[in-house]
Amino acid sequence: MPDRLFLFAGYDQDCIIDDAVIYYVKTLSKYGDVILCMDCNCPKKEIDKIKKYTIHTIASRHGEYDFGSYKRCFQYATNKNILKNYDYMYLVNDSVFGPTINIRQTLKNIEKTSTDAASMIVSKHKTHTFMESWFIRLNKKVFLSDWFSNFINSVEKEENKFDITIKY
């Protein structure tokens, strides 16, 4: 089985880690390591509900949306010098409920593509095509590159969600 690292971004306005997030993270943890970053100040009792399924959990309001959470997860993995241990890194968030199907086959399918990056869904806009950021697979060539490190570490708080969508 390939070694996978899932960077999981979550948010809850009430600072709870709900059953849907626990289920999603628990399922992913069967197929790789999970680092979770919640963009809210979850109390310890909430973190305790999920920490057995993660290698690290961060729960702190940063206001940078999902990419800010991905940034913090990536920084943790970089600081712990563990990125080199993985074949694939996934950017996953709680925007969707799931998985509702066996995720193992989905992972196998997305990993057999010959591209450096792939996603579960590719959408077409009027002017461009883009990968939906709620489930993106990156290969080692990408996530160990200076380009990706510079990109993800440049994420900052934006004025509104539209700016985030366009920029990231």
Regions found by a protein language model. Give the residues of each.
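Alpha-helical elements of Rossmann-like donor-binding domains used by nucleotide-donor carbohydrate transfer enzymes
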Residues: 23, 72, 105-109
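Conserved donor sugar-nucleotide recognition element shared by glycan-biosynthetic enzymes
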Residues: 66-70
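Conserved donor-nucleotide/metal-binding helix-loop-beta segment in metal-dependent transferases, i.e.
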Residues: 98-128
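N-terminal anchoring/stem segment of glycosyltransferases
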Residues: 1-65, 75-84, 88
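Acidic metal-phosphate-binding loop of nucleotide-sugar-dependent transferases
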Residues: 63, 96-97
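Catalytic core and acceptor-binding pocket of nucleotide-sugar-dependent glycosyltransferases
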Residues: 121-168
